[in-house]
């Protein structure tokens, strides 16, 4: 509560009050499907309501080309070369998923550009093995959606709900302790080919778990 301003999480505005000017808002807690929970309503007097409704990737070109989209991230599904489901079409930046930092957009663009150039020159090597990447417990989405095991891969993801004192686990191959996670802050983690090659199955699941659960792996 910086400066005495309370932070109310997992709640939404369900009603605004006032005739010629705003006088109050009614808020309510929401469930895991983000639907208001009856009986949790409370009214707060105020004269200003600021809305931050988020960003949605613009994908008219992707839709027109028939690129397969991630229904959660609202961007194209890509592999670790940033190639979409249509060979020769690559995606990066906010068209792929909404980023927090322009630094990550720039790095992603360089990566996509490099692989696109290799593809155009017919120098992009075919992967000997690919695995699907899936979002597990408390992970809303993860990018990329498919990876090979022969190059370093940086994964980006967002959580579904805030949690404290947890562990970010990537397929049981690597775990990182997190003091807290929240949907508004993107998480990222890089796995080397040496680590990725230890995967035994054909699916890599990214999830948020408790330290105790992570210790049982």
Regions found by a protein language model. Give the residues of each.
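A Rossmann-like FAD-binding core segment of flavoenzymes
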Residues: 1-60, 151-181
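Generic secondary-structure signature for well-ordered alpha-helical cores
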Residues: 5, 18, 30-32, 51, ...
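Conserved mixed alpha/beta catalytic, RNA-binding, or beta-rich assembly cores of soluble enzyme
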Residues: 7-9, 42, 69-71, 108, ...
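FAD-site-proximal beta/loop scaffold in flavoenzymes
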Residues: 47-99
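A conserved FAD-binding loop/helix module that cradles the flavin
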Residues: 92-144, 212-217
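Short, solvent-exposed loop/linker segments at the N-terminal edge
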Residues: 145-149
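Short, aromatic- and glycine-rich surface loops/edge beta-strands on solvent-exposed regions
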Residues: 155, 166-170, 194-216
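Aromatic sugar-binding surface patches on proteins
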Residues: 183-192
């Amino acid at each position: 509560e910086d400066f005495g301003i309370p932070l109310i999480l997992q709640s939404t505005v369900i009603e605004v009050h006032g005739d010629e000017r705003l006088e109050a808002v009614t808020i309510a807690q929401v469930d895991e499907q983000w639907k208001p929970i009856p009986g949790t309503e409370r009214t707060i007097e105020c004269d200003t309501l600021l809305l931050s409704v988020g960003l949605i990737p613009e994908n008219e070109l992707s839709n027109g080309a028939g690129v397969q989209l991630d229904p959660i991230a609202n961007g194209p599904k890509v592999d670790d070369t940033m190639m979409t489901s249509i060979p020769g079409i690559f995606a990066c930046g906010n068209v792929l998923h909404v980023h927090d930092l322009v630094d990550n957009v720039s790095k992603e663009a360089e990566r996509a550009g490099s692989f696109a150039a290799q593809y155009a020159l017919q120098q992009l090597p075919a992967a000997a093995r690919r695995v699907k990447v899936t979002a597990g417990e408390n992970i809303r989405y993860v990018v990329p959606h498919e990876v090979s095991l022969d190059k370093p891969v940086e994964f980006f993801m967002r959580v579904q709900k805030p949690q404290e004192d947890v562990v970010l686990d990537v397929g049981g191959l690597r775990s990182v302790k997190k003091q807290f996670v929240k949907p508004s802050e993107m998480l990222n983690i890089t796995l080397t080919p040496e680590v990725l090659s230890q995967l035994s199955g054909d699916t890599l699941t990214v999830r948020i778990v408790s330290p105790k659960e992570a210790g049982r792996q």
